[in-house]
Design a protein with these regions (language model features):
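Bacterial N-terminal signal peptides that target proteins for export
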Residues: 1-10
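N-terminal edge beta-strand
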Residues: 26-56
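A mature extracytoplasmic/lumenal domain signature
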Residues: 41, 60-64, 70-74, 109-111, ...
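Beta-strand cores of secreted/periplasmic/IMS beta-sandwich domains, seen most often
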Residues: 46-69, 102-109
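Short aromatic-acidic-glycine turn motif
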Residues: 74-83
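Extracellular/periplasmic metallocenter environments
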Residues: 89-139
Length: 139
């Protein structure tokens, strides 16, 4: 009986530690300034200027899913994220967006972030790559 209590207590402790270790970045902007990038046949706008802490939100207005890829970004560069985490809450560099849905990132410090959006197309090749840039801070 005592052994069962020990196992239960250990399991609860492990689950608590796992939940604490998997905490991720906040899902909203601290500055409350949100900048939308619409994903259509092209990005609108393809270059966006924001301040540190602002939220950049990609909006998929296409009829099929797309994915936003930010290969040079790490969690150290971010103050918030939504849609760029795996099932354990860890950041990943690809955010998948269903039609009429969004993903978002908030950048901590001045930087120039080049990203791309991959979208299915009826044109030859099957995938269209739409390049974009986020300029954080500065002017």
């Amino acid at each position: 009986m005592m052994f069962n209590k020990f196992i239960c207590a250990s399991a609860v402790l492990m689950m608590s530690a796992l939940a604490y270790g998997c905490t991720s970045l906040p899902e909203s902007s601290r500055t409350a300034t949100i900048h939308d990038v619409k994903v259509e046949e092209k990005l609108s706008p393809s270059t966006i200027r924001v301040q540190p802490g602002d939220e950049v939100r990609w909006v998929n207005v296409r009829k099929l899913p797309v994915q936003v890829e930010v290969p040079t970004v790490t969690t150290d560069d971010l103050s918030c994220q939504r849609g760029f985490s795996n099932w354990m809450g860890s950041f990943r560099e690809i955010g998948r967006i269903k039609p009429n849905e969004t993903v978002a990132l908030c950048f901590k410090k001045p930087a120039i972030i080049n990203y791309s959006v991959r979208a299915e197309t009826s044109l030859g090749g099957g995938m269209q790559v739409l390049p974009g840039t986020v300029e954080v801070g500065g002017r």
